[in-house]
């Protein structure tokens, strides 16, 4: 509908957040355009846990991190784990992720490569984690068609094999952050193992990337304490996954 990339700085508490969404007016008719928005992703996370009576952080811990045994993943890094918490770098200066409204729901997870490998494995093989199987399949279903790719719940999905140039071009912020016309799939197309499934993530001091092909049972997680261009992440990952898929 046209929500902004981030929740406006003036929205600083829960009451103001609900007021912001209540008075917000869509720029386009629902289901016609796709525009990347942490304000939208964060709202989805907030609403997903609303009836549980738990905070997003507690729900994540109980329903996702514990079943996957992701013991080094946090919203707020505890004192005992601070020694392992990397500094990010932006313009040569050390920094950490800054908090804000919906940071937990949209971009606030801190994790390790080992824990992300567990998350990656669960998404490649949902049968390996029965407690999360349905949620994983739901997240990888195809809800919108955007040109040559599909929108899952967070995930961006291409049919495999895919030309690296397509994914690289679409991941550039000059393209990824612009609005695009979409086709709503009704009903949503079910999860297809013959897919390239991926998601980039960035804050000022950090850059991350996850991509996998369930059919090939291969995937990659890239975590860096520097923000660097999405196309470079995609290009490297595609080369690695393509090579692994041949063996």
Predicted regions span which residues?
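Short active-site loop at a secondary-structure junction
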Residues: 26-40, 104-107, 209, 217
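Amphipathic, well-packed alpha-helical segments that form the structural scaffold of globular domains
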Residues: 18-26, 45, 49, 121
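Catalytic loop of the DD-peptidase/beta-lactamase superfamily, centered on the K-T-G motif
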Residues: 49-54, 58-62, 66, 96-247
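Well-ordered alpha-helical segments within folded domains of soluble proteins
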Residues: 40-45, 117
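A short, well-structured edge-of-sheet supersecondary motif
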Residues: 3-14, 71-73, 211-213, 220-221
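Second-shell loop/turn segments in exported
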Residues: 4-8, 29-33, 45-50, 104-107, ...
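Active-site-proximal loop and beta-strand segments within enzyme catalytic domains
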Residues: 1-38, 54, 62, 79-100, ...
